[in-house]
């Protein structure tokens, strides 16, 4: 394949051998791939900062016998605030984990790449309640993947009135008359539905000063987490750590 030149985001890195590290990169041009940074564990190596989690950089990569290897790199976004803040780092870890688990090796998606880049930049630069941010991110992610929940009309009959329930299996809001047609329909507070709509449609910067009660935040989080599990069939370990932070 020769040399690959691409912008990429580091999803995670691991140790390999005595002096090297291997990174999971989401590249803009070639999708997800694993690339080794030779000598990255040495303090004076030119690759010591090349695969820090969540950075955005331009890479030149070549294909070896067993792995891809990083030949050159140039930093684009360092995301220093994420590095310094435990909550921001935890949110970024969750975001990176979702993308890593969703993508297959070498699977390309420029729309998903740009969404990830935009989301990490928002985590780094904005001050948003972590539970609100993750709920907004999750809603935007499932919608981007083709699983946008129906929120404006009953998912069964299409009526706009009395949307008092939410069903994961049916795919969204359910009216009073149709609640028995979705076996998992659960009561949905009117304010919760409004919050879900706002988190889905509003850009991240609109979430900085929003006032939402703890009860509504938790209800939205539970609904969206269950919805993701239903449609993506994936659970994310780093979400547990964020939940624990919220309870500290």
Swiss-Prot record:
Q: Name one Pfam family in it.
A: RecO_C
Q: What is the lineage of its organism?
A: Bacteria, Bacillati, Bacillota, Clostridia, Thermoanaerobacterales
Q: Which domain of life is it from?
A: Bacteria
| Protein's name in the database | DNA repair protein RecO
Q: Which gene encodes it?
A: recO
Name the InterPro entries for this protein.
ARFGAP/RecO, DNA_rep/recomb_RecO_N, NA-bd_OB-fold, RecO, RecO_C
- Membership in a protein family: Belongs to the RecO family.
Sorted keywords for this record are: DNA damage, DNA recombination, DNA repair
Q: Where is the signal peptide?
A: none
Q: Which GO terms describe its cellular component?
A: bacterial nucleoid
Role:
Involved in DNA repair and RecF pathway recombination.
């Amino acid at each position: 394949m020769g040399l690959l030149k691409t912008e990429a985001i580091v999803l995670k890195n691991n140790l390999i051998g005595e002096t090297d590290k291997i990174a999971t990169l989401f590249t803009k041009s070639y999708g997800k791939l694993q690339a080794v940074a030779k000598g990255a564990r040495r303090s004076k190596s030119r690759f010591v900062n090349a695969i820090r989690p969540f950075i955005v950089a331009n890479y030149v990569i070549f294909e070896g016998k067993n792995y891809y290897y990083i030949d050159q790199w140039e930093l684009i976004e360092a995301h220093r605030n994420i590095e310094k803040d435990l909550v921001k780092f935890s949110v970024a870890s969750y975001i990176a984990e979702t993308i890593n688990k969703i993508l297959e090796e070498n699977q390309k998606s420029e729309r998903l790449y740009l969404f990830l880049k935009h989301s990490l930049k928002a985590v780094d630069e904005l001050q948003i309640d972590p539970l609100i941010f993750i709920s907004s991110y999750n809603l935007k992610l499932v919608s981007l993947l083709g699983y946008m929940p129906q929120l404006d009309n009953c998912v069964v009959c299409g009526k706009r009135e009395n949307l008092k329930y939410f069903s994961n299996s049916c795919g969204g809001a359910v009216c009073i008359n149709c609640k028995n047609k979705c076996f998992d329909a659960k009561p949905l507070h009117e304010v919760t539905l409004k919050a879900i709509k706002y988190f889905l449609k509003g850009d991240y910067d609109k979430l900085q000063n929003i006032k939402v009660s703890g009860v509504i935040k938790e209800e939205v989080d539970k609904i969206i987490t269950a919805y993701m599990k239903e449609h993506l069939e994936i659970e994310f370990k780093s979400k547990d750590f964020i939940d624990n932070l919220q309870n500290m």
